[in-house]
Amino acid sequence: MTLGIIEVDKKGAITRNGLLRGVIEKNGKVLSSDKELIGIIHDNGNIFSVKNGMTGIVQENGNIFSTKYGHIGQLKENGTIYSIKKGQVGLYKGNLRKVGGFLLLFFDQF
């Protein structure tokens, strides 16, 4: 599965391959493109989904852990996103912590 290019602009708008997928607000709330609250990303890296509770954590070193599946991937400094099972799955431009949280919510919600 290739996620394509995911971008988060300075206002927090999240796009994938040019299509608006949601927004990350300054308080860490993640809203879908129709403004429905789908989750929250805390400053400590914990990620919570409205539907499923805590879905994971993004560590400072870029490791992505899912509460359901354990260590699922890595965010590299160059923005490359790797899945342990599938290899390179995408490219990210922007804040890695934010997109890490969004990606876990993305797998869970979209």
PLM regions and their residue ranges:
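Long terminal segments
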Residues: M1-R21, K26-G28, E36, N44, ...
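Catalytic zinc-binding patch centered on the HExxH motif and its immediate surroundings
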Residues: G39
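Extended, low-complexity, charged alpha-helical tracts
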Residues: S49-V50
